[in-house]
Amino acid sequence: MIKLRLKRFGKKRETSFRLVACNSTSRRDGRPLQELGFYNPRTKETRLDTEALRTRLGQGAQPTDAVRTLLEKGGLLEKKVRPAEVLGKQKQEKERSAKKKDAAASETSE
């Protein structure tokens, strides 16, 4: 399976990443099949080869979570609602409804 992942490079404590397509069993800094972009987390600079990325995604390449976030910001993928976000929202809604019930109960008892 082909994965889209970040390949680390740069100086110590001044890292940058290349967005690469590679085999899922290869090492993080191993030889990639293709370089598809660049990301610098310090300056927030992002460069993406959109044609090559669309081709790889069309072939069934699976992006990692970090790469998916970059692609969503770049407009290549639709924003996906992750289960943790949904569970967090549901939990917040339950807490809000419980507070409303407690407030209503305390008002009626006074």
UniProtKB/Swiss-Prot annotation:
Any one GO biological process: translation
Biased composition (Basic and acidic residues): 81-104
Gene Ontology MF term list: structural constituent of ribosome
Keywords: Ribonucleoprotein, Ribosomal protein
Residue segments, region Disordered: 81-110
Keyword NAD: no
GO terms for cellular component: cytoplasm; small ribosomal subunit
Keyword Ribosomal protein belongs to the record: yes
InterPro entries, sorted: Ribosomal_bS16 (IPR000307), Ribosomal_bS16_CS (IPR020592), Ribosomal_bS16_dom_sf (IPR023803)
Family note: Belongs to the bacterial ribosomal protein bS16 family.
Entry-linked NCBIfam families: S16
Descriptive protein name: Small ribosomal subunit protein bS16
Source lineage: Bacteria, Bacillati, Cyanobacteriota, Cyanophyceae, Synechococcales
